[in-house]
């Protein structure tokens, strides 16, 4: 068996010191050193084999964090792991104490194609770090070769044009990597979908002294449409892999909870209990239902392409009732996700592996909207999540 861990880590605006990433937002050298220190320590604590990072402005800044984590791994191992001359060095507990550095790991960085480098107008990219390397060069998906046109259905009659939504590019890149783990190659997608922050047209809705509720509602609508369209672009890429029989894992900042429409677009439909109860799409009478054979076919077609939430699988098998990766305004929710194809589902007969545990690193999170709560802008405003996976077959 082969064991590995895979994690999602939104680092919150990683860029070097004295560089204005958003308007009037920079890190002093002292702040940058503190942030780098915290990130390296968090990466060391996680000790994940595969990490998807979001909100990376500079590859060099991330590489510095990774290098520092490797140095600390050496120091920690020297202090914690007994010398091999000791008779008890073979005890399993000491294997758990050891932390592998990332010196031999490979890093794939996807810069944001909309990032011009102009101070105050920067756009973040993302990255994947893999101790297993990559079986082929990772692929960046952002500017679409053909615009995505989403037509709206006519509500009455035979209207020629009920309107449509057009998407030419996703707001932040999607990074696709094929990673060799044990005797398998797993396709990993890292994403950061459009946030709920409204997209405002002109200065009016953005000027809070001239509050424009309709303009702000329209901004929220634009953001929601974009996020769901980006989810569909990601879903299209996921299906290309699944339909080739490839195991898939999807991670990142979805900016929505598990049951949001955008997340359900990514995961695909959950099969209905029995399609033989359903009225056929071409029914001629009220008793015209799908057959048992069609029910089996439909269920398999949907199940084969459905992704499963690592968090949900963990909650189902444990007594834990709450995992969260963000806190704001009294709302604690998970908007960072790890999804996986049925190749890793414990009830799938032909599974290649399954998740043994799920970790959430969220002790640093506080709800900054509460006056009594501490808040530190230098740490991440997201919790990190990690799935502990076991593959069947292969060397341990």
Residue ranges and their predicted role:
Residues 217-245:
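A long, amphipathic alpha-helix that forms part
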Residues 1-126, 207-211, 352-354, 358, ...:
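N-terminal, active-site-proximal structural segment of metallo-dependent hydrolase catalytic domains
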Residues 142-164, 194-222:
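Short, flexible helix-coil linker/hinge segments at the edges of structured domains or between repeats
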Residues 113, 118-121, 125-182:
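A well-ordered secondary-structure block
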Residues 1-6, 133-136, 170-212, 394-396:
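Beta-strand-turn-beta hairpins that frame and shape the catalytic cleft
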Residues 14-19, 197-199, 347-348:
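Short, solvent-exposed loop/turn elements at domain surfaces
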Residues 12, 56-57, 192-194, 254-257:
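Catalytic metal-binding/acid-base residues of hydrolase active sites
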Residues 59, 129, 133-140, 146-152, ...:
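Metal-dependent phosphoester-hydrolase catalytic domains
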């Amino acid at each position: 068996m082969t064991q590995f861990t895979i994690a999602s880590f939104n680092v919150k605006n990683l860029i070097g010191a004295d560089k204005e990433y958003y308007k009037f937002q920079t890190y002093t050298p002292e702040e940058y050193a503190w942030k780098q220190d915290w990130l390296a320590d968090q990466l060391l604590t996680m000790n994940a084999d595969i990490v998807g990072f979001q909100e990376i402005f500079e590859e060099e800044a991330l590489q510095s964090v990774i290098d520092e984590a490797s140095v600390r791994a050496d120091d920690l191992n020297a202090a914690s792991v007994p010398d091999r001359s000791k008779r008890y060095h073979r005890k399993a507990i000491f294997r758990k104490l050891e932390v592998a550095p990332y010196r031999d790991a490979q890093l794939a960085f996807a810069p944001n194609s909309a990032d011009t480098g102009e101070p105050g107008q920067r756009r973040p990219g993302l990255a994947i770090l893999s101790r297993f390397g990559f079986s082929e060069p990772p692929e960046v998906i952002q500017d679409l070769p053909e615009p995505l046109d989403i037509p709206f259905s006519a509500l009455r009659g035979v209207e020629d044009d009920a309107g449509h939504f057009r998407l030419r590019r996703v707001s932040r890149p999607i990074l696709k990597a094929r990673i060799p783990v044990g005797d398998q190659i797993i396709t990993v997608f890292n994403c950061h979908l459009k946030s709920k922050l409204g997209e405002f047209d002109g200065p009016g809705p953005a000027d809070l002294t001239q509050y424009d509720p309709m303009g702000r509602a329209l901004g929220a609508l634009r953001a929601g449409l974009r996020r769901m369209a980006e989810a569909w672009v990601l879903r299209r890429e996921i299906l290309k892999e699944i339909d080739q029989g490839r195991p898939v894992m999807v991670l990142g900042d979805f900016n929505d909870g598990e049951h949001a429409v955008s997340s359900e677009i990514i995961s695909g439909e959950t099969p209905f209990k029995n399609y033989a109860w359903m009225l056929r799409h071409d029914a001629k009478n009220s008793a015209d239902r799908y057959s048992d054979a069609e029910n089996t076919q439909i269920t398999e077609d949907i199940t084969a392409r459905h992704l499963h939430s690592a968090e949900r699988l963990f909650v189902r098998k444990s007594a834990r009732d709450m995992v969260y990766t963000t806190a704001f305004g009294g709302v604690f929710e998970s908007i960072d996700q790890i999804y996986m194809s049925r190749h890793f589902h414990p009830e799938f007969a032909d599974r290649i592996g399954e998740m043994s545990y799920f970790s959430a690193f969220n002790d640093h999170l506080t709800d900054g909207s509460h006056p009594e709560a501490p808040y530190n802008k230098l740490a991440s405003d997201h919790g990190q999540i990690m799935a502990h996976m076991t593959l069947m077959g292969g060397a341990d």
